[in-house]
Amino acid sequence: KDAFLAIEDAEKLQITLNNETVCNEINGWYVDKSIKTVSLPEIKKGLNELIVKLPFGKRTNTEWCYILGDFGVKTEGCFSTIIEPNTHVGFSSLTNQGLPFYGGNVSYKTNIHTPDCYAIICANYFRGALIKVLVDGEEKGIIAFAPYRLKIDEMTKGNHTIEFILYGNRINTFGGMHNISQPKWVGPNFWRSEGDQWCYEYILKDTGILASPIIEIYENSTNK
């Protein structure tokens, strides 16, 4: 429950969910202000039917719509199923952890015990814009470019929480996920594949921190 539908021109559409009329009163927007959100009735367990009616002609461009809410998604071939949300993720692709279409930021936390030291963090295998690193809630820097290392000065003896905030991208949210050729360029025709260059299955890109960051500890007594 408490889900939203994000869609362009929402106020001009006729929308029903399981034969129940959806009030198209705008209550927000998603990513871009042209993609507006409306509240959906409760989504029931099992098969649900969402119908969107709009005036359609030769010059009409239809765009994707998005169901937003506190839930996870499982993709299998051509099908996607809403599942319980995954509140804990590991260092691997988010597409296999209930977040195949997620394009926002993700926070990873790990606890360590250190002596008085400095540390070097290496996170060289991720798919996103950059990683922000925090120690005990204090921002220490970002990892974005090779060699993907960050020095943390003056860590005191004791327990610390290291947080990695991955800034995501929208490749699995707005990208051409049915384009078999997967070209390296992006333009209008990237979303217009047809024939044997189009498939019903989702062709997803890995996102997230894909391998555990390495934390190197150097005791201050050895760094004279």
Please provide the spans of the model-predicted regions.
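A short, structured loop/turn motif at beta-sheet edges
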Residues: L40-L47, T75-F79, D116, I152-T161, ...
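Short, well-structured beta-strand segments enriched in hydrophobic/aromatic residues
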Residues: A3, P41-K58, T156-I180
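Glycine/proline-rich low-complexity spacer/linker segments in large multi-domain proteins
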Residues: V22, P55-E84, Y167-I217
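Extracellular/lumenal ectodomain signal focusing on beta-strand-rich modules
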Residues: Q14, E42, D70, N111, ...
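Aromatic-lined ligand-binding clefts that engage carbohydrates, nucleic acids, or primary amines
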Residues: K1-N19, L50, N111-G137, I143-A144, ...
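Edge strands and adjacent loops of beta-rich recognition modules
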Residues: T81-T110
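Short beta-strand segments within Ig-like beta-sandwich modules, predominantly Fibronectin type-III
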Residues: I26-Y30, E139-A144
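Short beta-strands within extracellular/lumenal beta-sheet-rich domains
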Residues: K1, K36-V38, Y102-H113, P147-L150
